[in-house]
């Protein structure tokens, strides 16, 4: 697989808004350092027990820690795909970052409350304890955060709740005031399923024909993804979708001063393109950027070009001075 530099991605964009940084100085450093894997739990002030996985560089640490927050359809695992060079966690850790991925409430090995109690506000409240624990373990005062899809709304709410703990922020495939018209029917179906009595967790169906909504991909990676979702995340909390449609993070966008990158694929079908532009314009932070990765869909983690673009762009933003 060809490794693309962030510079190359930016040059090939159909459009990009950049504020406060020069494209030409972005290095493409080699991935060489060894990493240590850790798995642990954090009991939050909100009463949740959340599982975290960490990848810590054995040497060459840059003194920065980041937290990766998943979206609605799968837990933490797509940040660490164990096939060839698809792991975002490995890539970032080998370049010197302390990398943590959380399993949010309602998912995987973490506490599963009533599914209607899983939303951006409750999850952001949980993550305050997580961010504090990460800061303690890594010896930093602030933690960078990346959130995918509904995880973006979680980050916005977190940036409003405890901005003093958030270093830099990346919103990947995260809607703002509306979702893409192509995704409305599926979102509506999920919301309606959650209205049935006793259905606070609903079937997760989005993964079944995911290859129809991907840029060039490797069969074994897509097969891995489908197997993981089917075996570990076959049900998802019913509270996520109705909350995401309302997006409690909307008021935070214009208020936040946290440096923020909006990162989408050019073939996004969850994020509406004009909505993404509106969010960029409304962002209150003077240090902000929007990058569109050519050919990428919503799940760029499992795409050949998309995974490489995510890795290098994320490293750039989290280490930008």
Give residue ranges: language-model regions.
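Conserved hydrolase catalytic core segment
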Residues: 141, 146, 150-177
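Conserved acidic catalytic loop of the alpha/beta-hydrolase fold
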Residues: 124-141
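Alpha/beta-hydrolase
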Residues: 184-263
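Conserved alpha/beta-hydrolase
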Residues: 86-111
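Catalytic histidine-centered segment of alpha/beta-hydrolase-like enzymes
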Residues: 296-307
């Amino acid at each position: 697989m060809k490794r693309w530099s962030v510079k190359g991605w930016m040059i090939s964009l159909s459009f990009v808004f950049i504020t406060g940084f020069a494209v030409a100085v972005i290095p493409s450093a080699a991935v060489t350092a060894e990493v240590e894997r850790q798995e642990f739990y954090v009991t939050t002030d909100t009463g949740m027990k959340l599982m975290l996985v960490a990848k810590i560089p054995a040497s060459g640490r840059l003194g920065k820690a980041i937290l990766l927050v998943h979206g609605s359809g799968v837990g933490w695992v797509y940040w660490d795909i164990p096939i060839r060079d698809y792991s975002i966690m490995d890539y970032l850790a080998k370049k010197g970052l302390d990398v943590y991925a959380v399993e949010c409430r309602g998912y995987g090995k973490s506490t599963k409350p009533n599914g209607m109690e899983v939303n951006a506000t409750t999850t952001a409240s949980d993550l305050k304890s997580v961010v504090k624990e990460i800061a303690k373990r890594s010896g930093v005062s602030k933690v960078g955060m990346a959130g995918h899809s509904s995880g973006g709304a979680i980050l916005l709410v977190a940036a409003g709740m405890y901005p003093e703990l958030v270093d830099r922020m990346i919103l990947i495939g995260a809607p703002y005031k509306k979702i893409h018209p192509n995704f409305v029917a599926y979102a509506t179906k999920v919301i309606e399923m959650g209205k049935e009595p006793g259905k606070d967790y609903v079937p997760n169906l989005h993964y079944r024909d995911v290859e129809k909504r991907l840029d060039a991909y490797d069969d074994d990676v897509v097969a891995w993804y489908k197997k993981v979702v089917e075996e570990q995340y076959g049900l998802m909390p019913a509270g996520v979708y109705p909350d995401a449609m309302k997006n409690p993070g909307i008021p935070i966008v214009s208020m936040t001063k946290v440096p923020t990158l909006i990162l989408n694929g050019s073939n996004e079908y969850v994020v509406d393109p004009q909505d993404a532009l509106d969010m960029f314009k409304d962002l209150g932070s003077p240090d902000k950027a929007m990058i569109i990765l050519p050919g990428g869909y919503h799940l760029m983690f499992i795409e050949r070009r998309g995974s490489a673009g995510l890795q290098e762009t994320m490293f750039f933003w989290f280490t930008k001075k």
